[in-house]
Amino acid sequence: MASGVGAAFEELPHDGTCDECEPDEAPGAEEVCRECGFCYCRRHAEAHRQKFLSHHLAEYVHGAQAWTPPADGEGAGKEEAEVKVEQEREIESEAGEESESEEESESEEESETEEESEDESDEESEEDSEEEMEDEQESEAEEDNQEEGESEAEGETEAESEFDPEIEMEAERVAKRKCPDHGLDLSTYCQEDRQLICVLCPVIGAHQGHQLSTLDEAFEELRSKDSGGLKAAMIELVERLKFKSSDPKVTRDQMKMFIQQEFKKVQKVIADEEQKALHLVDIQEAMATAHVTEILADIQSHMDRLMTQMAQAKEQLDTSNESAEPKAEGDEEGPSGASEEEDT
């Protein structure tokens, strides 16, 4: 192994082994550095070449001079330069490692941030899709409910129009205001049958020869009749019940039968009063209908007179216009003829 580098030492012959390996286990040298003069095996030569890029290694030849020691100043300066270069490389390598580690950490943080943003966007998209689905379901449910409500409303209106009791009653009232035999308005009252009839019933109908009256006369007559029959019947019923209940000979069954008979009499009086009231209502409705019919007839007659007067006025206006046209033509020809005579 070589030793002594510098002016104080003489160059010793190399022993032909690697100066980097352990002396006891050092293999044979294969390359030698021309700058530092050390001999290396294949492995250490490659490491020395990568560590000191400015050094030049050559094949080791046993017995040849491996290295010429430079001057003291030159060697020291070269060694200092090599050390400085090595330190700079180490600093650069450390800075590169730090920058790489920082870049890796930044890239990891960016990737984590991107993953978090992707997760958040996925969650937001899922929430949005769920909200859209819920909105669609709600809108569909509202549309279905609206359609059902419309169909129900239509069904109700149809049902009301078909089964509305007020409409049916109005139709019945309108039908009652017409004569069932002749289809005319009920404008006369038959005293014998106590019935409303039309004007044709006493002429060609079933009421020929009967005593008749107007609707106003029949209404006043029915309304002026004494309506105390119901009150008198109730008073008589109370008196008879008192007398019957005070008789000790009357059994319980006889008392029940008596009460039923008396109440049937009262019910008949009530039914007669009901028919009388309904009859008055019918006569009043017939009077109103006849009155409206008279008013409509008067309006129609007035309209007919107005239309006739308008037609006559238009005819007179047309006649006056026709008579005025020839006169205007003659006036125009007169001055022209006079001017022609003057010219001649």
UniProtKB/Swiss-Prot annotation:
Biased composition (Basic and acidic residues): 75-92
Pfam families named in the record: zf-B_box (PF00643)
Residues given in the record as Zn(2+) binding sites: C179, H182, C201, H207
Residue span of region Disordered: 1-25, 68-165, 309-344
Modified-residue entries (Phosphoserine), positions: S336, S339
InterPro entries: TRIM/RBCC, Znf_B-box
Biased composition (Acidic residues): 93-165, 330-344
Entry coiled-coil feature ranges: 290-325
A Gene Ontology biological process term: positive regulation of non-canonical NF-kappaB signal transduction
GO molecular function, one term: zinc ion binding
Record's keyword terms, sorted: Coiled coil, Metal-binding, Phosphoprotein, Zinc, Zinc-finger
B box-type zinc finger segments: 174-215
Record's subunit section: Interacts (via coiled coil) with TRIM17 (via coiled coil).
Function per UniProt: May play a role in the process of differentiation and maturation of neuronal cells. May regulate the activity of TRIM17. Is a negative regulator of PAX6 expression.
Name the record gives this protein: Tripartite motif-containing protein 44
Biological source species: Pongo abelii
